[in-house]
Structure formats: structure tokens, C-alpha cells
């Protein structure tokens, strides 16, 4: 008798973020990602307890976890994994997660870490998993190919084609049976700007107010964006000033890629030291994250900002507001280089209020970390899967507007059910969110991709 392989999507079929996928055979059980929902903090304490309890249940009996990248909506519940569980990810992802230990705890500290390079395979009993580097706003992101029971399943993770390494999608294996494809921005017709175009927009913005001090709100883990910002600063004769957390993130990544600028290798990159952050590091006996940055040589002070504010571009986030309140500059402008939804979060209210009073202009210069509609089509054109399974999306039905319905496996909107809406199995409905590989029927693809016209 052959083995039975099941696929369970615990979360992500009708939700952006919080992804967790389980693949189980008679001999092994693996998880891909173990994310915290993006809206976790908005839930009641009772709801949060249930969410964590569910995730802990998924972790029982797991033989290994494969992590796609270092964003909390994919790794936020790693702490629930049993002690010494093997975890696989790229070296860059592990480096990013280790930096979580600056302000908190490394979520992989209790796990057995196994770094993977692109194209490298590993075996967990009868399951073979291969990592493939892809482009995303989190440095070191990867997709996975899972092979078992004669079937091949590709998990896209979070992916885009307009980034610095966008062309890497062409390395993804072709002709897989199933493609779990992210759809964060499905049906968004607009093309995303490249990081080079973002850089040029920074340059233009700095030139429009060359005598102003510029603040840029950007994620410390978006390495490609910080590099684009740094290049723009160099082109405009300005100095990029970053906080200790960002400086340590860059230093860690530069250990794997010497092309990444750091405060010790780049003359036009300096550090500011928010008292709240430095005090917290000192209290946690983590002064090394301060002194390794050579403050005597690399520090930019309040006096420096006051004397020549136009010389500086400062990387900020809402948590450094106390520091910003002490800066004296005649003209200040803010550039948001981050997902727009963060601006309206309740915890940014005080920051927004300060910006409204002290910044003469607020500009958006950003590019998504996710594939747009045309990019999703290009990915599918390259891979040519037998069946597409939407994930990391709040609009799975939208996949039917750009791909052939007969090749999309939908889950139902009811938690705990999984329905197959393929042309061969529309009537099927299981009582659990689990399905056998052989129950996802497929056929050779013809005219898989629909033409897409924006409304």
C-alpha cells in the first residue's frame, strides 16, 4: 500500500499573513511558515489565546519547519515549536531573526538551525524540500519545492518580480503539480516601480527641497530599500543617518554580502542614538550593539542636526518620536517608504500628530514587496503548474479572473472546510482543511491565463 500525503493550509487561504502550511506523509510532518496574523493585536485577549492555542496544536509532532522569510506574519509563532525542532531557512533569514534579540529574544534560539542555499535540498524522511531564493522586501526570502509520493508542490512564499533580484523567479522549477501562490495584491493592475526607480524618486524629492532635512520612514529589514536610499543620498551629497537597530541589521547582512553599506564601511552613513533605545539595550546588558558602532566617530548629535539639517536624511519610525521632538530644523519633510496601512494604525497617532505640526510635506515613495497581477501571470507562465492554490490573500476568488477556473483549487470561506472547485471536483467538500494530494484533480494546462483589464 502506498503512502498517504496530505496538504493542510492552517491559515492564509482567506487572509493576508499568518501563513502556515502542513504537509504530512505516513513517515513525516513538516510545516512551512508559522506566522502571526497581521491583526493579532486587534483581537481580544481571549481570541489571542485561542489563536496561539491553535498554532501550538499545529506544532505537535512536527519533524521540521521551513521558513520562507523574516517577516512576523510568517515567523511570529516560532516560539511555540518544541525545543530542538529542526528549522530550515536561508542564512540571511537566520541573520535577520538573530537581530530580533537586540530588543527581545531570537525566536529561533531554542531550535536547531539548518541554513539553506538556493537550490539546496534536504530530506525529512520521505519528503524532499528544496529552497529557491526569490525577491521580496525581506532580505533572504525563498520559495520551496516539496516532493513526495511522486508529486511536486511549489510554495511561492512572498514574492515580487520588480525588485533587485526579481529575475530569480526564473530559477523556480517548472511543471509542478501544485503551486501555492501568494495573492496579496491580486487584481491590482498598476505596475510597481523598481528599486532603481524608487531611488530616482528619492533623488528628485531631495532636490526639490535641498535645504530641508528629510525623514524617511522605512523598515529596517528592507535592505534593498535602504541601499536605494543610501545611493540616493550619495548622489545628492547627503548623509544617511540610521538608528542602532538598523545599523546592526546592515552589519549582520554585510557579513554575508560585503556590498551592503554599513556605518563602518560607508563614509556617508552615520548613527543617531535614541535615548529610549540605548537605555533599553543597556538595561538588557546588550551594550555591544551600541559600542560596536563606534559612537565617538559615527554619532550624529542634536547639535549636528541643528547646525546643518540640510546635510542629513534620517531613517525613522514612530517609536523614535521622543528623539524627533528634540530636533531643531527650519524645514522638515517626511517620506513614507512603507505600506500605506501602517500610517493609519492606532499606535502611530502621536507620530502622525507630530508630523502634521512639524513637517511641511509628506510624500509617498514606495514599492510593494508583493507581485502585481502581471507578475503573478508571469510566474504561472514560467512554472506551468497543473493546479494553483491561492494563499496569503484575502481575495482568493480573484484568481479566477486572471487564471483558468478549472485550474484553481479554492478553499471554502468556512473555517475548517476545504472545497475543490476544479472542473473535475467541484462537489467535493471535506470536513477538515486537509486534502489528499491525489484528491486535487488536474489536467494538462490549456489557456491557463486569462487576459486582464483593469476596471
Predicted regions and their residues:
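Intrinsic-disorder-associated, low-complexity terminal segments enriched in Asp/Asn/His/Tyr and depleted
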Residues: 158, 430, 439-441, 450
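Hard-cation-handling environments
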Residues: 193-323, 327-328
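His/Asp/Glu-rich metal-coordinating catalytic cores
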Residues: 2-66, 72-224, 228-235, 239-241, ...
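Cap/insert and terminal regions of metallo-dependent hydrolase folds
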Residues: 163-245, 329-404
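Charged, glycine-enriched surface loops/patches
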Residues: 403-421, 435-437, 449
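ATP-dependent carboxylate-amine ligase
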Residues: 328-331, 448-450
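Short acidic-hydrophobic, aromatic-tinged amphipathic segments that line or gate anion-handling sites
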Residues: 112-118, 271-274, 409-411
Amino acid at each position: 500500500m502506498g503512502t498517504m500525503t496530505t496538504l493542510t493550509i492552517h491559515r492564509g487561504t482567506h487572509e493576508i499573513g499568518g501563513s502556515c502550511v502542513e504537509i504530512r506523509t505516513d513517515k513525516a510532518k513538516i510545516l512551512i511558515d508559522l506566522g502571526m496574523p497581521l491583526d493579532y493585536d486587534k483581537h481580544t485577549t481571549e481570541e489571542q489565546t485561542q489563536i496561539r492555542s491553535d498554532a501550538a496544536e499545529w506544532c505537535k509532532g512536527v519533524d521540521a519547519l521551513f521558513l520562507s522569510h523574516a517577516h512576523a506574519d510568517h515567523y511570529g509563532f516560532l516560539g511555540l515549536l518544541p525545543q530542538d525542532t529542526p528549522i530550515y531557512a536561508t542564512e540571511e533569514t537566520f541573520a535577520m531573526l538573530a537581530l530580533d534579540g537586540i530588543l527581545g529574544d531570537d525566536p529561533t534560539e531554542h531550535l536547531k538551525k539548518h541554513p539553506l542555499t538556493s537550490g539546496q535540498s534536504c530530506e525529512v524522511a520521505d519528503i524532499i524540500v528544496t529552497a529557491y531564493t526569490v525577491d521580496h522586501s525581506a532580505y533572504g526570502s525563498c520559495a520551496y519545492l516539496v516532493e513526495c509520493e511522486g508529486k511536486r508542490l511549489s510554495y511561492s512564499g512572498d514574492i515580487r518580480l520588480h525588485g533587485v533580484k526579481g529575475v530569480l523567479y526564473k530559477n523556480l522549477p517548472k511543471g509542478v503539480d501544485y503551486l501555492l501562490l501568494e495573492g496579496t495584491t491580486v487584481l491590482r493592475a498598476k505596475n510597481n516601480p523598481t528599486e532603481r526607480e524608487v531611488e530616482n524618486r528619492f533623488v528628485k524629492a531631495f532636490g526639490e527641497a535641498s535645504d530641508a532635512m528629510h525623514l524617511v520612514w522605512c523598515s529596517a529589514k528592507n535592505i534593498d530599500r535602504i541601499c536605494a536610499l543610501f545611493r540616493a543620498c550619495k548622489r545628492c551629497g547627503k548623509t544617511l543617518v540610521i538608528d542602532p537597530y538598523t545599523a546592526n541589521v546592515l552589519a549582520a547582512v554585510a557579513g554575508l554580502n560585503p556590498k551592503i553599506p554599513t556605518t563602518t564601511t560607508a563614509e556617508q552613513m552615520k548613527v543617531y542614538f535614541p535615548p529610549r533605545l540605548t537605555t533599553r539595550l543597556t538595561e538588557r546588558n546588550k551594550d555591544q550593539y551600541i559600542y560596536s558602532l563606534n559612537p565617538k566617530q559615527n554619532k550624529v548629535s542634536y547639535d549636528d542636526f541643528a547646525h546643518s539639517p540640510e546635510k542629513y536624511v534620517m531613517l525613522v519610525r514612530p517609536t523614535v518620536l521622543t528623539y524627533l521632538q528634540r530636533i531643531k530644523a527650519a524645514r522638515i519633510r517626511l517620506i513614507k517608504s512603507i505600506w500605506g496601512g501602517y500610517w493609519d494604525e492606532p499606535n502611530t497617532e502621536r507620530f502622525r500628530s507630530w508630523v502634521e505640526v512639524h513637517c511641511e510635506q509628506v510624500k509617498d515613495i514606495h514599492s510593494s514587496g508583493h507581485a502585481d497581477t502581471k507578475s503573478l501571470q508571469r510566474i504561472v507562465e514560467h512554472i506551468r503548474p497543473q493546479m494553483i492554490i491561492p494563499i496569503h490573500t484575502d481575495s482568493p476568488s480573484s484568481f479566477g479572473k486572471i487564471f483558468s477556473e478549472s485550474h484553481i483549487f479554492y478553499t471554502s470561506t468556512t473555517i475548517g472546510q476545504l472545497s475543490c472547485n476544479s472542473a473535475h471536483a467541484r462537489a467535493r467538500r471535506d470536513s477538515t482543511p486537509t486534502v489528499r494530494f491525489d484528491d486535487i484533480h488536474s489536467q494538462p494546462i490549456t489557456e491557463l491565463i486569462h487576459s486582464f483589464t483593469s476596471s
